[in-house]
Amino acid sequence: MDIKEAGPFPVKKEQFRMTVNGQAWEVAAVPTTHLSDLLRKEFQLTGTKVSCGIGRCGACSILIDGKLANACMTMAYQADGHSITTIEGLQKEELDMCQTAFLEEGGFQCGYCTPGMIIALKALFRETPQPSDKDIEEGLAGNLCRCTGYGGIMRSACRIRRELNGGRRESGF
């Protein structure tokens, strides 16, 4: 029995199974461990950032079964049996389309928000392959950029949309 001290009350660790970036994992954790902590500490996946810790900034954005989620608001027990994708799961041998767009369109400044922004756009474009400018703004509404680099972020999003649209020029950002 693996026990973790949580103040004066011992808390029992439990076994959880999940797929992270295509790899099956079994991990022992306290059920209320934040998924962001599990990803960063147990799996050494530090691309998932933690900033606000209350689900308002989007720095910890991940995909759970392809749906956008905040890792800082998701507990280990909620991830049990699910497929998790982090920013590290997008890159195999070459940069993903979203990552390339951010790189070539200047969609980052300090880079702290970039993983969350890219993950949020992956979720948006999966659900809405040709989003309007308003759809893009709404899709990124849960992600904050401390450097206010929104112009480059929107250019990156529009480039992705354009590439998915066969490269045709469009109005918008």
Swiss-Prot record:
Residues 14-90 form the 2Fe-2S ferredoxin-type domain. Keywords: 2Fe-2S, Iron, Iron-sulfur, Metal-binding, NAD, Oxidoreductase, Purine metabolism. One of its GO terms (biological process) is hypoxanthine catabolic process. Its EC number is 1.17.1.4. Pfam families: Fer2, Fer2_2. Could be composed of four subunits: PucA, PucC, PucD and PucE. This is Probable xanthine dehydrogenase subunit E. The gene is pucE.
